[in-house]
Amino acid sequence: MAEVRLGENESIDSAIRRFKKKIQKAGILSEVKRRERYEKPSLRRKRKAEAARKGGRN
C-alpha cells in the first residue's frame, strides 16, 4: 500500500500530491476501476487479446 509521511514544514497539499503520484505509479486506481464490476473470463480474454493486437500493455 502507498504510504506518505508528512515531513517537517511540509504542507498537507504537497503530501497529498505525493500520495496521488504514488497511487498512480503503483496502478492502484486503474486496478480499482477494473474491479468495479465483474468481468466474465471470456470478456477478459477478449480484452487482453485486443490490447495485445494494438500493442499496448496488458
Curated annotation (Swiss-Prot):
Alphabetic keyword roster: Ribonucleoprotein, Ribosomal protein
GO terms under biological process: translation
Cross-referenced PROSITE patterns: RIBOSOMAL_S21
Pfam families: Ribosomal_S21
Compositionally biased region (Basic and acidic residues): 49-58
Region (Disordered): 38-58
GO MF, any single term: structural constituent of ribosome
GO cellular component: ribonucleoprotein complex; ribosome
HAMAP family associated with the record: Ribosomal_bS21
Family: Belongs to the bacterial ribosomal protein bS21 family.
Name of this chain's protein: Small ribosomal subunit protein bS21A
Source organism: Trichormus variabilis (strain ATCC 29413 / PCC 7937)
